[in-house]
UniProtKB/Swiss-Prot annotation:
GO MF entries: BMP binding; cytokine activity; growth factor activity; identical protein binding
Biased composition (Basic and acidic residues): 142-156
Assembly notes: Homodimer; disulfide-linked. Interacts with serine proteases, HTRA1 and HTRA3. Following LPS binding, may form a complex with CXCR4, HSP90AA1 and HSPA8. Interacts with high affinity with NOG; inhibits chondrogenesis. Interacts with high affinity with BMPR1B and lower affinity with BMPR1A; positively regulates chondrocyte differentiation and induces SMAD-dependent signaling. Interacts with FBN1 (via N-terminal domain) and FBN2. Interacts with TGFBR3.
Name listed for the protein in its UniProt record: Growth/differentiation factor 5
Length: 495
């Protein structure tokens, strides 16, 4: 009798527990009405407003975000996922970056967690004001859009070199075919020399009530020491701006100028020139021939000369004689000229090589880089090139050289352009007499006419060339006048 009673009580107790569980389930209004795709633990509103994420979306930092990406490792053999692990995991902050705190709303938190903001742009175009957000300095670094190249730093460019007015006048005089006018003081040296190098004075006057001595200093370390013919010093006498300072000695007598070398160590000063100073009505140049001294000092890196004026055994203020150097322009500074003639023919390519590098590869890179810079202006100016007449005989054709279009106007002063000409055309049998063919060219042309496949034709090449004078700035920033041979084609022939 007890066993049936115990079974009855047990069944009644189980029925009571089932009834209580059913009441609890019926009391949850949202149970069984979840929106498909919503995750456990979220309300209906959250499930509707939360956008689904694509699977296996790659994010910067090497992490993979997506539905089931985080929970895939937690799935069992049955494929079920616990609801607790569906909740977003809190990722540790990356090194170097500030920790972002969650906002007060779960909806805001979920939206922010899935918004990918490109670098340099904040959501809505505004900076975040939340606590723990990135500092303003970090945000400013992000303002540059991806792929935008950094602003290149402007390369250092040395100040432009202003040519001395005397060198410009010298170029105009010596480049003239008739050699009319100009300075006669350099006619002898210029007639023998093909190179004239100029050096600007780097000395400064002493500050004081009077200047008794002046030192003229020139850097000649980059001077070519071979084939030198002469040297001279040119100093400008300029009428003083201060009318209180007379341009002639107060006694009315003529002062004496003395030019000597600067004493150094055990080397005493050597007297170079003594001359009288006449009255100064205007500006003029005092020219001193110092070749005898310079022959002994040409291997030095620096040349120093000293100037002083005397009257009756007393030193005279040089500023009163028109030698004041304060606030003088480049074309008014003292100039040291060296005349030379090289025994071998100088190639213009050597000067280009000195400015661009040491090996031929660097030179060609320099040439092509300058060509690329000027390619657009050349294309716009020249237009289409006329087609060649392949049947024309060998003759001289036009070739206009423009150094500015080549990008060399930063170191070539004059001329900026000239007519070089070139040779073009066929060398066919019989060769004309004006082509001045050699005996070898005649035989080669005859063989080519008989059997073109066995013997190539002769070439149309320059047979006579002439020089031009170029005024340029060398690699040491000195203004140089130089005559380059074989720069202009005068006649063409078959060789």
């Amino acid at each position: 009798m007890r066993l049936p009673k115990l079974l009855t009580l047990l069944l009644w107790h189980l029925a009571w527990l089932d009834l209580e569980l059913i009441c609890t389930v019926l009391g949850a209004p949202d149970l069984g009405q979840r929106t498909p795709g919503a995750k456990p633990g979220l309300t209906k509103a959250e499930a509707k407003e939360r956008p689904p994420l694509a699977r296996n979306v790659f994010r910067p930092g090497g992490h993979i975000y997506g539905v089931g990406a985080t929970n895939a490792r937690a799935k069992g053999s049955s494929g079920q996922t616990q609801a607790k692990k569906d909740e977003p995991r809190k990722m540790p902050p990356r090194s170097g970056g500030p920790e972002t705190k969650p906002g007060p709303s779960s909806q805001t938190r979920q939206a922010a967690a899935r918004t990918v903001t490109p670098k340099g742009q904040l959501p809505g175009g505004k900076a975040s004001s939340k606590a723990g957000s990135a500092p303003s300095s970090f945000l400013l670094k992000k303002t540059r859009e991806p792929g935008t190249p950094r602003e290149p730093k402007e390369p250092f460019r040395p100040p432009p070199i202003t040519p001395h007015e005397y060198m410009l006048s010298l170029y105009r005089t010596l480049s003239d075919a008739d050699r009319k006018g100009g300075n006669s003081s350099v006619k002898l040296e210029a007639g023998l020399a093909n190179t004239i190098t100029s050096f600007i004075d780097k000395g400064q006057d002493d500050r004081g009530p009077a200047v008794r001595k002046q030192r003229y200093v020139f850097d000649i370390s980059a001077l070519e020491k071979d084939g030198l013919l002469g040297a001279e010093l040119r100093i400008l006498r300029k009428k003083p701006l201060d009318v209180a300072k007379p341009a002639v000695p107060s006694s009315g007598r003529v002062a004496q100028l003395k030019l000597s070398s600067c004493p150094s160590g055990r080397q005493p000063a050597a007297l170079l020139d003594v001359r009288s100073v006449p009255g100064l009505d205007g500006s003029g140049w005092e020219v001193f021939d110092i070749w005898k001294l310079f022959r002994n000092f040409k291997n030095s890196a620096q040349l120093c000369l000293e100037l002083e004026a005397w009257e009756r055994g007393r030193a005279v203020d040089l500023r009163g004689l028109g030698f004041e150097r304060t606030a003088r322009q480049v074309h008014e500074k003292a100039l040291f000229l060296v005349f030379g003639r090289t025994k071998k023919r100088d190639l213009f390519f050597n000067e280009i090589k000195a400015r661009s590098g040491q090996d031929d590869k660097t030179v060609y890179e320099y040439l092509f880089s300058q060509r690329r810079k000027r390619r657009a202006p050349l294309a716009n100016r020249q237009g289409k090139r006329p087609s060649k007449n392949l049947k024309a005989r060998c003759s001289r054709k036009a070739l206009h050289v423009n150094f500015k279009d080549m990008g060399w106007d930063d170191w070539i002063i004059a001329p900026l352009e000239y007519e070089a000409f070139h040779c073009e055309g066929l060398c066919e049998f019989p060769l004309r007499s004006h082509l001045e063919p050699t005996n070898h060219a005649v035989i080669q042309t005859l063989m080519n006419s008989m059997d073109p496949e066995s013997t190539p034709p002769t070439c149309c090449v320059p047979t006579r060339l002439s020089p031009i004078s170029i005024l340029f700035i060398d690699s040491a920033n000195n203004v140089v006048y130089k005559q380059y041979e074989d720069m202009v084609v005068e006649s063409c022939g078959c060789r």
